[in-house]
Amino acid sequence: MKGTLKTFQQFTNKMDRYNIEELFKKSRIRNISLELTNASLAVYLTTKEGYVPCIYGATTDARIGIKFIHDVLNINVRYIIVECNTFESFYGVPVISKTELGRHQKLCMFCFSNNVDESNAVLEINPAVIIDCTQALKENIKKAFFLFFYDHSQSFSNQISIFNDNISQLTYYEYIKSFLTGDNYQGPSFEEKYKYFDVYKHYCNKAKNPCSWINLGSCFGDTIYWSLMINLRFDMIYAIESDSNNIQVLSRNIELLSPSDSKKITIINKKCGLNAEDLALDDLNLDSPVSLINMDIEGGEVDALLSAKNIIKCYKPILAICAYHKPDDLLTIPRTISKICPSYYKFILRKYSSGTGKHYNGIHRTNELVLYAVPI
Protein backbone atom coordinates (compact mmCIF):
# COMPACT_ATOMS: atom_id res chain seq x y z
CA MET A 1 0.00 0.00 0.00
CA LYS A 2 2.73 2.48 0.98
CA GLY A 3 4.62 1.64 -2.18
CA THR A 4 1.55 2.28 -4.29
CA LEU A 5 0.97 5.68 -2.74
CA LYS A 6 4.64 6.62 -3.03
CA THR A 7 4.57 5.87 -6.74
CA PHE A 8 2.11 8.71 -7.27
CA GLN A 9 3.99 11.39 -5.36
CA GLN A 10 5.17 12.48 -8.82
CA PHE A 11 1.63 13.58 -9.63
CA THR A 12 1.22 15.83 -6.59
CA ASN A 13 3.78 18.38 -7.76
CA LYS A 14 2.90 18.66 -11.45
CA MET A 15 0.41 21.51 -11.27
CA ASP A 16 -2.14 23.01 -8.93
CA ARG A 17 -5.05 23.12 -11.33
CA TYR A 18 -6.12 21.25 -14.44
CA ASN A 19 -7.90 23.25 -17.11
CA ILE A 20 -10.81 21.10 -18.26
CA GLU A 21 -12.19 23.83 -20.50
CA GLU A 22 -8.94 23.92 -22.48
CA LEU A 23 -8.93 20.13 -22.57
CA PHE A 24 -12.26 20.12 -24.42
CA LYS A 25 -11.00 22.72 -26.88
CA LYS A 26 -7.64 21.14 -27.68
CA SER A 27 -8.08 17.37 -27.29
CA ARG A 28 -7.46 15.37 -30.43
CA ILE A 29 -8.56 11.80 -31.06
CA ARG A 30 -5.56 9.51 -31.30
CA ASN A 31 -5.50 6.77 -33.90
CA ILE A 32 -5.14 3.41 -32.22
CA SER A 33 -6.64 1.02 -34.73
CA LEU A 34 -7.28 2.58 -38.17
CA GLU A 35 -5.36 0.42 -40.63
CA LEU A 36 -2.32 2.11 -42.11
CA THR A 37 -3.45 1.20 -45.63
CA ASN A 38 -6.80 2.93 -45.16
CA ALA A 39 -5.19 5.95 -43.53
CA SER A 40 -2.53 6.44 -46.20
CA LEU A 41 -5.02 5.82 -49.02
CA ALA A 42 -7.43 8.43 -47.67
CA VAL A 43 -4.70 11.04 -47.28
CA TYR A 44 -3.28 10.34 -50.75
CA LEU A 45 -6.62 10.45 -52.57
CA THR A 46 -7.85 13.63 -50.90
CA THR A 47 -4.58 15.57 -51.14
CA LYS A 48 -3.10 14.32 -54.42
CA GLU A 49 -5.95 13.04 -56.59
CA GLY A 50 -8.73 15.51 -55.82
CA TYR A 51 -11.12 13.09 -54.14
CA VAL A 52 -13.74 14.85 -52.03
CA PRO A 53 -13.84 13.66 -48.38
CA CYS A 54 -17.41 12.96 -47.26
CA ILE A 55 -19.51 10.93 -44.85
CA TYR A 56 -22.82 9.26 -45.64
CA GLY A 57 -25.61 10.01 -43.15
CA ALA A 58 -26.15 12.72 -40.53
CA THR A 59 -25.85 10.38 -37.54
CA THR A 60 -24.16 10.45 -34.15
CA ASP A 61 -21.43 8.30 -35.68
CA ALA A 62 -20.96 10.93 -38.38
CA ARG A 63 -20.72 13.61 -35.71
CA ILE A 64 -17.81 11.78 -34.08
CA GLY A 65 -16.47 10.87 -37.51
CA ILE A 66 -16.01 14.51 -38.49
CA LYS A 67 -13.64 15.01 -35.57
CA PHE A 68 -12.07 11.56 -35.98
CA ILE A 69 -11.09 12.27 -39.61
CA HIS A 70 -9.80 15.74 -38.76
CA ASP A 71 -7.76 14.65 -35.74
CA VAL A 72 -6.40 11.35 -37.03
CA LEU A 73 -5.90 12.15 -40.73
CA ASN A 74 -5.85 15.96 -40.75
CA ILE A 75 -8.65 15.88 -43.32
CA ASN A 76 -11.66 18.20 -43.21
CA VAL A 77 -14.89 16.55 -44.32
CA ARG A 78 -16.36 18.47 -47.26
CA TYR A 79 -19.90 17.06 -47.28
CA ILE A 80 -22.36 15.04 -45.28
CA ILE A 81 -24.40 13.14 -47.89
CA VAL A 82 -28.02 12.28 -47.05
CA GLU A 83 -31.02 10.78 -48.85
CA CYS A 84 -33.15 13.88 -48.52
CA ASN A 85 -31.65 17.21 -47.54
CA THR A 86 -33.71 18.95 -44.83
CA PHE A 87 -31.00 21.14 -43.27
CA GLU A 88 -27.97 23.05 -44.53
CA SER A 89 -25.19 21.87 -42.25
CA PHE A 90 -24.32 19.22 -39.69
CA TYR A 91 -21.86 20.35 -37.01
CA GLY A 92 -20.30 22.83 -39.38
CA VAL A 93 -20.18 20.55 -42.44
CA PRO A 94 -22.44 21.28 -45.44
CA VAL A 95 -25.21 18.74 -45.99
CA ILE A 96 -26.23 17.72 -49.49
CA SER A 97 -28.50 15.04 -50.91
CA LYS A 98 -27.42 12.37 -53.36
CA THR A 99 -29.30 14.15 -56.12
CA GLU A 100 -27.53 17.44 -55.38
CA LEU A 101 -24.15 15.78 -55.58
CA GLY A 102 -22.57 16.45 -58.95
CA ARG A 103 -22.18 13.42 -61.18
CA HIS A 104 -18.71 12.01 -61.65
CA GLN A 105 -17.32 13.92 -58.68
CA LYS A 106 -14.67 11.67 -57.17
CA LEU A 107 -15.55 10.83 -53.58
CA CYS A 108 -13.57 9.52 -50.64
CA MET A 109 -16.42 8.12 -48.57
CA PHE A 110 -15.76 7.49 -44.87
CA CYS A 111 -18.06 4.97 -43.18
CA PHE A 112 -18.51 4.82 -39.41
CA SER A 113 -21.58 2.69 -38.74
CA ASN A 114 -21.65 -0.28 -41.10
CA ASN A 115 -23.43 1.86 -43.71
CA VAL A 116 -21.33 0.54 -46.57
CA ASP A 117 -24.46 -0.56 -48.46
CA GLU A 118 -25.90 2.95 -48.36
CA SER A 119 -22.54 4.36 -49.42
CA ASN A 120 -22.46 1.94 -52.34
CA ALA A 121 -25.70 3.50 -53.58
CA VAL A 122 -23.76 6.73 -54.13
CA LEU A 123 -21.23 4.77 -56.17
CA GLU A 124 -23.92 4.18 -58.78
CA ILE A 125 -23.53 7.75 -59.98
CA ASN A 126 -20.10 8.73 -58.64
CA PRO A 127 -16.67 7.13 -58.67
CA ALA A 128 -15.69 6.67 -55.04
CA VAL A 129 -13.40 4.90 -52.65
CA ILE A 130 -14.90 3.73 -49.37
CA ILE A 131 -12.76 3.99 -46.24
CA ASP A 132 -14.39 1.82 -43.58
CA CYS A 133 -13.62 3.35 -40.16
CA THR A 134 -16.34 1.46 -38.27
CA GLN A 135 -14.06 -0.81 -36.28
CA ALA A 136 -11.48 1.89 -35.63
CA LEU A 137 -14.12 4.20 -34.19
CA LYS A 138 -15.61 1.41 -32.11
CA GLU A 139 -12.24 0.50 -30.62
CA ASN A 140 -11.08 4.08 -30.09
CA ILE A 141 -14.13 5.86 -28.78
CA LYS A 142 -16.82 5.04 -26.25
CA LYS A 143 -19.47 6.99 -28.10
CA ALA A 144 -22.02 7.65 -25.35
CA PHE A 145 -19.35 9.12 -23.06
CA PHE A 146 -17.64 11.08 -25.83
CA LEU A 147 -20.83 12.81 -26.94
CA PHE A 148 -22.16 13.42 -23.43
CA PHE A 149 -18.87 14.93 -22.27
CA TYR A 150 -18.79 17.34 -25.22
CA ASP A 151 -22.49 18.22 -24.90
CA HIS A 152 -21.95 19.07 -21.22
CA SER A 153 -18.40 20.37 -21.43
CA GLN A 154 -19.09 23.44 -19.30
CA SER A 155 -20.60 21.35 -16.50
CA PHE A 156 -17.59 19.02 -16.52
CA SER A 157 -15.24 22.02 -16.60
CA ASN A 158 -16.89 23.45 -13.50
CA GLN A 159 -17.12 20.12 -11.68
CA ILE A 160 -13.39 19.80 -11.05
CA SER A 161 -13.76 22.46 -8.34
CA ILE A 162 -15.42 19.94 -5.99
CA PHE A 163 -12.06 18.19 -5.59
CA ASN A 164 -9.43 19.78 -3.36
CA ASP A 165 -6.58 17.27 -3.48
CA ASN A 166 -4.21 17.13 -6.41
CA ILE A 167 -4.56 13.40 -7.07
CA SER A 168 -8.35 13.75 -7.39
CA GLN A 169 -8.01 16.66 -9.81
CA LEU A 170 -5.45 14.85 -11.93
CA THR A 171 -7.54 11.66 -11.92
CA TYR A 172 -10.60 13.63 -13.05
CA TYR A 173 -8.61 15.41 -15.79
CA GLU A 174 -6.95 12.27 -17.15
CA TYR A 175 -10.15 10.21 -16.96
CA ILE A 176 -12.06 12.70 -19.11
CA LYS A 177 -9.08 13.12 -21.42
CA SER A 178 -8.97 9.38 -22.10
CA PHE A 179 -12.54 9.46 -23.45
CA LEU A 180 -11.98 12.57 -25.57
CA THR A 181 -8.81 11.24 -27.19
CA GLY A 182 -9.49 7.49 -27.31
CA ASP A 183 -6.18 7.03 -25.53
CA ASN A 184 -5.38 4.97 -22.44
CA TYR A 185 -5.95 6.49 -19.03
CA GLN A 186 -2.60 7.97 -17.92
CA GLY A 187 -3.35 9.27 -14.43
CA PRO A 188 -2.89 7.83 -10.95
CA SER A 189 -4.09 4.23 -10.64
CA PHE A 190 -4.15 2.12 -7.48
CA GLU A 191 -4.39 -1.61 -6.94
CA GLU A 192 -7.98 -2.84 -7.09
CA LYS A 193 -7.73 -4.72 -3.80
CA TYR A 194 -7.56 -1.33 -2.04
CA LYS A 195 -10.74 -0.07 -3.72
CA TYR A 196 -13.11 1.41 -1.11
CA PHE A 197 -10.65 0.82 1.74
CA ASP A 198 -7.58 3.02 1.22
CA VAL A 199 -9.54 6.24 1.61
CA TYR A 200 -11.80 4.70 4.27
CA LYS A 201 -8.86 3.63 6.45
CA HIS A 202 -7.32 7.08 6.18
CA TYR A 203 -10.48 8.93 7.20
CA CYS A 204 -12.35 6.42 9.36
CA ASN A 205 -11.14 8.15 12.51
CA LYS A 206 -13.56 10.91 11.51
CA ALA A 207 -16.43 8.44 11.36
CA LYS A 208 -18.38 7.71 14.50
CA ASN A 209 -17.05 4.45 15.90
CA PRO A 210 -16.94 2.28 12.74
CA CYS A 211 -19.70 -0.26 13.18
CA SER A 212 -21.72 -1.46 10.18
CA TRP A 213 -20.81 -1.64 6.51
CA ILE A 214 -23.36 -1.71 3.68
CA ASN A 215 -21.67 -3.55 0.80
CA LEU A 216 -23.99 -2.86 -2.14
CA GLY A 217 -23.12 -4.95 -5.17
CA SER A 218 -21.36 -7.72 -3.27
CA CYS A 219 -21.08 -9.99 -6.31
CA PHE A 220 -19.02 -13.02 -5.16
CA GLY A 221 -17.79 -11.48 -1.91
CA ASP A 222 -14.31 -10.52 -3.05
CA THR A 223 -14.56 -7.09 -1.42
CA ILE A 224 -15.46 -8.69 1.90
CA TYR A 225 -12.46 -10.98 1.66
CA TRP A 226 -10.14 -8.05 0.99
CA SER A 227 -11.53 -6.15 3.98
CA LEU A 228 -10.61 -9.08 6.20
CA MET A 229 -7.15 -9.34 4.62
CA ILE A 230 -6.34 -5.76 5.63
CA ASN A 231 -7.88 -6.22 9.08
CA LEU A 232 -10.90 -3.96 8.75
CA ARG A 233 -13.45 -4.91 11.38
CA PHE A 234 -17.17 -4.20 11.41
CA ASP A 235 -19.89 -5.19 13.85
CA MET A 236 -22.10 -6.12 10.89
CA ILE A 237 -21.76 -6.36 7.11
CA TYR A 238 -24.85 -6.16 4.91
CA ALA A 239 -23.88 -7.93 1.68
CA ILE A 240 -26.49 -6.91 -0.90
CA GLU A 241 -26.53 -8.46 -4.37
CA SER A 242 -29.34 -8.42 -6.95
CA ASP A 243 -28.13 -11.28 -9.18
CA SER A 244 -29.43 -14.66 -7.97
CA ASN A 245 -26.57 -16.55 -9.60
CA ASN A 246 -24.03 -14.33 -7.89
CA ILE A 247 -25.82 -14.85 -4.59
CA GLN A 248 -25.25 -18.60 -4.78
CA VAL A 249 -21.51 -18.10 -5.19
CA LEU A 250 -21.48 -15.37 -2.55
CA SER A 251 -23.20 -17.64 -0.04
CA ARG A 252 -20.72 -20.46 -0.63
CA ASN A 253 -17.80 -18.07 -0.26
CA ILE A 254 -19.11 -16.65 3.00
CA GLU A 255 -19.47 -20.18 4.36
CA LEU A 256 -15.71 -20.58 3.96
CA LEU A 257 -15.05 -17.83 6.47
CA SER A 258 -14.51 -18.49 10.13
CA PRO A 259 -17.72 -18.59 12.19
CA SER A 260 -16.68 -15.42 14.00
CA ASP A 261 -16.56 -13.56 10.67
CA SER A 262 -19.43 -15.21 8.80
CA LYS A 263 -21.92 -14.62 11.61
CA LYS A 264 -21.47 -10.87 11.14
CA ILE A 265 -22.53 -11.00 7.50
CA THR A 266 -26.15 -10.69 6.39
CA ILE A 267 -26.73 -11.63 2.74
CA ILE A 268 -29.61 -9.89 0.96
CA ASN A 269 -30.73 -10.85 -2.55
CA LYS A 270 -32.51 -7.65 -3.64
CA LYS A 271 -32.11 -4.80 -6.08
CA CYS A 272 -31.79 -1.45 -4.34
CA GLY A 273 -33.63 1.57 -5.63
CA LEU A 274 -36.81 3.63 -5.51
CA ASN A 275 -39.30 1.33 -7.26
CA ALA A 276 -41.94 -0.51 -5.25
CA GLU A 277 -40.28 -3.89 -5.76
CA ASP A 278 -36.82 -2.57 -4.84
CA LEU A 279 -35.11 -2.57 -1.48
CA ALA A 280 -34.80 0.89 0.02
CA LEU A 281 -31.67 0.98 2.16
CA ASP A 282 -33.53 3.09 4.70
CA ASP A 283 -35.74 0.05 5.35
CA LEU A 284 -32.84 -2.11 6.56
CA ASN A 285 -33.10 -3.25 10.15
CA LEU A 286 -29.76 -1.93 11.31
CA ASP A 287 -28.25 -3.26 14.52
CA SER A 288 -25.57 -0.57 14.76
CA PRO A 289 -24.57 2.75 13.18
CA VAL A 290 -23.23 2.69 9.62
CA SER A 291 -19.68 3.91 8.99
CA LEU A 292 -19.22 2.82 5.35
CA ILE A 293 -21.47 2.42 2.31
CA ASN A 294 -19.95 1.29 -0.97
CA MET A 295 -21.84 0.85 -4.23
CA ASP A 296 -21.03 -0.88 -7.52
CA ILE A 297 -24.42 -1.62 -9.06
CA GLU A 298 -24.13 -0.99 -12.80
CA GLY A 299 -25.62 2.49 -12.97
CA GLY A 300 -28.17 2.28 -10.16
CA GLU A 301 -26.07 4.28 -7.71
CA VAL A 302 -28.11 7.50 -7.70
CA ASP A 303 -31.40 5.75 -6.89
CA ALA A 304 -29.68 3.66 -4.24
CA LEU A 305 -28.27 6.80 -2.62
CA LEU A 306 -31.72 8.38 -2.58
CA SER A 307 -33.08 5.22 -0.96
CA ALA A 308 -30.50 5.66 1.82
CA LYS A 309 -30.93 9.37 2.52
CA ASN A 310 -32.09 8.84 6.12
CA ILE A 311 -29.12 6.58 6.88
CA ILE A 312 -26.76 9.12 5.34
CA LYS A 313 -28.30 12.03 7.25
CA CYS A 314 -28.29 10.11 10.52
CA TYR A 315 -24.90 8.40 10.54
CA LYS A 316 -22.84 10.47 8.06
CA PRO A 317 -20.98 7.37 6.80
CA ILE A 318 -18.06 7.48 4.41
CA LEU A 319 -19.47 6.82 0.93
CA ALA A 320 -17.49 4.97 -1.76
CA ILE A 321 -19.52 5.08 -4.97
CA CYS A 322 -18.52 3.70 -8.37
CA ALA A 323 -18.78 6.54 -10.88
CA TYR A 324 -18.00 4.96 -14.25
CA HIS A 325 -21.19 3.20 -15.38
CA LYS A 326 -23.00 6.21 -16.85
CA PRO A 327 -21.64 9.25 -18.70
CA ASP A 328 -23.26 11.61 -16.17
CA ASP A 329 -22.05 9.81 -13.02
CA LEU A 330 -19.38 12.39 -12.22
CA LEU A 331 -22.09 15.07 -12.26
CA THR A 332 -25.15 13.40 -10.77
CA ILE A 333 -23.59 11.31 -7.99
CA PRO A 334 -21.86 14.18 -6.12
CA ARG A 335 -24.89 16.42 -6.67
CA THR A 336 -27.15 13.76 -5.17
CA ILE A 337 -24.91 13.38 -2.12
CA SER A 338 -24.71 17.15 -1.64
CA LYS A 339 -28.48 17.40 -1.91
CA ILE A 340 -28.95 14.77 0.79
CA CYS A 341 -26.36 16.32 3.12
CA PRO A 342 -25.56 19.90 2.06
CA SER A 343 -22.06 21.12 2.95
CA TYR A 344 -21.23 18.04 5.00
CA TYR A 345 -19.08 15.98 2.63
CA LYS A 346 -15.88 16.60 0.71
CA PHE A 347 -15.17 14.59 -2.41
CA ILE A 348 -12.17 12.46 -3.37
CA LEU A 349 -11.69 10.64 -6.68
CA ARG A 350 -9.57 7.53 -7.13
CA LYS A 351 -8.96 5.20 -10.08
CA TYR A 352 -8.14 1.52 -9.62
CA SER A 353 -6.74 -1.09 -11.98
CA SER A 354 -8.98 -4.01 -12.90
CA GLY A 355 -8.40 -7.71 -12.38
CA THR A 356 -6.53 -7.85 -15.70
CA GLY A 357 -4.34 -4.96 -14.65
CA LYS A 358 -1.07 -6.91 -14.92
CA HIS A 359 -1.58 -7.47 -18.63
CA TYR A 360 -2.48 -3.84 -19.29
CA ASN A 361 -0.09 -2.38 -16.73
CA GLY A 362 -3.02 -1.31 -14.59
CA ILE A 363 -4.28 1.23 -17.11
CA HIS A 364 -7.98 1.22 -17.98
CA ARG A 365 -10.26 4.08 -18.88
CA THR A 366 -13.75 2.67 -18.50
CA ASN A 367 -13.86 1.04 -15.10
CA GLU A 368 -12.99 1.11 -11.41
CA LEU A 369 -13.42 4.85 -10.83
CA VAL A 370 -14.61 5.51 -7.28
CA LEU A 371 -16.02 8.75 -5.92
CA TYR A 372 -15.57 9.05 -2.17
CA ALA A 373 -17.65 11.33 0.02
CA VAL A 374 -15.85 11.92 3.31
CA PRO A 375 -17.36 13.81 6.25
CA ILE A 376 -15.70 17.19 6.71
Tell me what each language-model feature is.
Residues 73-75, 128, 232-233, 257-262, ...:
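Short helix-capping segments at alpha-helix termini
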Residues 78-84, 237-241, 318-322:
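Short internal beta-strands
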